[in-house]
Amino acid sequence: KGINKKSHQKLLDFKSVSTKQVNQLSLLSKELCKDIKIKKSLEEKNSTLFKKNMRRNFEANKLFNSYINKFGGRFANESKLETKDINEDFNSLSDLLLTYSTMNTNFKESANKSETFFEGLFKKFASRREDFRLLRANMFGVFRKLSISIGKEYVKKGLIKNSDDIFYLDFEDIDGTIKMDDIDFSKINIRKKEYNFFKTFQPPSHFKVANGIWPSLFDSKVDQSNSGIGASRGKVTGRAVVLEEFSIPEKDSFDILITRRTDPGWTSLMAISKGIVVEHGGILSHASIVARELGIPAVIGIKNACKRFKTGDTIFVDGDKGVVEAISK
């Protein structure tokens, strides 16, 4: 049975854990920055001083630990074990808390509107999909901590130089399957070079092999289409920031976030954006779900957006029609 646009939008309006995270982060940042000494340690990016000041502020420490226990595994590239989490990357954590401390980010959760049984069923399980993503992220965070602990033991034994080197070994190298004397540690440097090489190019999202001929891994064609998927309704014009990787831009330096792809760890950055443009994704990708829930206009599927637009460009985002246009460059 066909479904009209209005019914489609209604179906996609469901609660997820993302709004809860953003609101708790906003509450936490404001509470921490009430304490002058804690705020100063964040501004100086001094993790030692931060921990010291947190120990003397019971309420702030309690709120911080509550957030970390619930959302500690949620950070950019959260499903990549080699990526530092928010407990390790204090600079990013400081930037995030300071940014949120001065912003109005109290988003309301989607209200339960009248709906049919099957609409409610869809929303229930679509929402749980996001819950499971958070559980997965937290589990990856736990596994990273365990891996780093093993890495530190390997460093003490002189087997590897850095604890992070553990991620370039095979699982059999650390679970006891292979004897320590038989592990080939030289593959660490080889795999690091391979890892850095594969970070240097962006292959096409999909390709086909015709008559046994493989296409180039490099996508040389620049698609100039301004049309994508209108993932979240609304219109906005503003300054763009183009991010190849996750980072917290300077306060008030941008309005529209443009990137290749996101994962749930980008939620905190999306929440302080007025518009979102993503090259890859679909109507149920995380960026789409978060944008709808937070009421931020978003267009997904604008090919080569990171090449066509530059940081500082003024662009127009139409989440209703799925169109993105450059106003000035």
Task: List the predicted regions and their residue ranges.
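Contiguous hydrophobic, helix-prone segments at protein termini
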Residues: 1-226, 230
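Short, flexible coil/turn micro-motifs enriched in small/turn-prone residues
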Residues: 67-68, 153, 223-225, 229, ...
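Mature hydrolase/peptidase catalytic cores and their serpin-fold inhibitory cores, especially
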Residues: 199-267, 276
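Acidic, glycine-rich flexible loop/linker segments
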Residues: 240-255, 260-262, 266-329
